[in-house]
Amino acid sequence: MQRIGMVANLEKPRVRETALDIINYLESRNVRVLISTRKAAALGCPEKGVAEEEVIAAEGLLALGGDGTLLRAARLVAPAGTPILGINLGHLGFLTEIELTELYPALDKLLAGAYRIEERMMLRGTVQRPEKALTCTALNDIVVTKGAFSRMLRLEVYIDTAYLDTYPADGLIVSSPTGSTAYSLSAGGPLVSPQLQVMILTPICPHTLYTRPLVVPGEQEIRVCVHAPGAEVMLTVDGQQGLHLRDGDVIRVTRARTPARLIRLQDNTFYSLVREKLKEGGSRQDDENPAATVNPETDSKYPHSHPGSTG
């Protein structure tokens, strides 16, 4: 790779320092690092800024932060097919590929082409209104949920043209296999291998005893009709983007045309990640004297503690 894009969550500890060091490390190997004009200015190197379109069109993209940063990156570059390498400076790091301690060997592998691409199904959501249709894409999930002080919703659900049920519930989660380890899991949904092309429909606090999550083939469409006069209803995308819904809105969720493409440098399987990451339950504690990774170019050291955030 000769042109590598970078996105970074600069709100996280150590991200700014790490980003600047990565830039120096890659440039010393004749690799051009592409950063948006806004991010470059925030990093203190405005001369390196380029249009976002150039970042998207890079040969690969580094996502520095946590799982939330990778989710944003996936929505940004998936239509262009740009592969993403997630570098975890967050907390759990279920989606990211490497920890900070593995950074420089991982960059060397990337430049040597010693990696594979793993495709992850994404979701496309459309909110159908008389005046226009609003669209979104998600890697994890598209969620319809009530506001803090709203009564329960009545959500009429169809699979293609077949009526499924009307759910009296606090909301519904439509997740991808990747999102099956996120909000859907917390709401009682199943773990689903990311190799499958399916959607998972998981009700949130249903007001019936028989309602259970449902797995739907990826080639079908899930249609949700909102019946909630006077209630506050929200649609959220990967827990990061939101839209106020109206009574009578129709939400259509299908498999997106293009998948997210994740760079994999290691042999970890989904099943080993489930065992290792979910077993931690987000409760990993920092060591008293955390190990550090060393940049062979600068001898600068970065402790690999894990702050409690997923962005």
Swiss-Prot record:
Keywords tagged on the record: ATP-binding, Cytoplasm, Kinase, NAD, NADP, Nucleotide-binding, Transferase
Q: Where does NAD(+) bind?
A: 67-68, 72, 140-141, 151, 170, 181-186, 240
Enzyme Commission (EC) number: 2.7.1.23
Entry's Gene Ontology BP terms = NAD metabolic process; NADP biosynthetic process
- List, alphabetically, the Pfam families matched: NAD_kinase, NAD_kinase_C
Which cofactors does this protein require?
a divalent metal cation
Q: Which SUPFAM superfamilies match?
A: NAD kinase/diacylglycerol kinase-like (SSF111331)
Q: Where is the sequence biased in composition, kind Basic and acidic residues?
A: 278-287
The UniProt annotation puts the region (Disordered) at 278-311
The keyword Electron transport is annotated on this UniProt entry? no
Q: Name one GO molecular function term.
A: NAD+ kinase activity
Stored InterPro entries: ATP-NAD_kinase_N, ATP-NAD_kinase_PpnK-typ_C, NAD/diacylglycerol_kinase_sf, NADK
**What GO cellular component entries does it have?**
cytoplasm
Where on the tree of life does the source sit, at the highest rank? Answer: Bacteria
The record's subcellular locations are: Cytoplasm
Q: Catalysed reaction per UniProt?
A: NAD(+) + ATP = ADP + NADP(+) + H(+)
**Active-site residues per Swiss-Prot or TrEMBL entry:** 67
Keyword check for Phosphoprotein, yes or no.
Answer: no
PANTHER family in UniProt: NAD KINASE
**Family to which this protein belongs:** Belongs to the NAD kinase family.
Quote the function comment for this protein.
Involved in the regulation of the intracellular balance of NAD and NADP, and is a key enzyme in the biosynthesis of NADP. Catalyzes specifically the phosphorylation on 2'-hydroxyl of the adenosine moiety of NAD to yield NADP.
What is the recorded name of this protein?
NAD kinase
Gene field: nadK
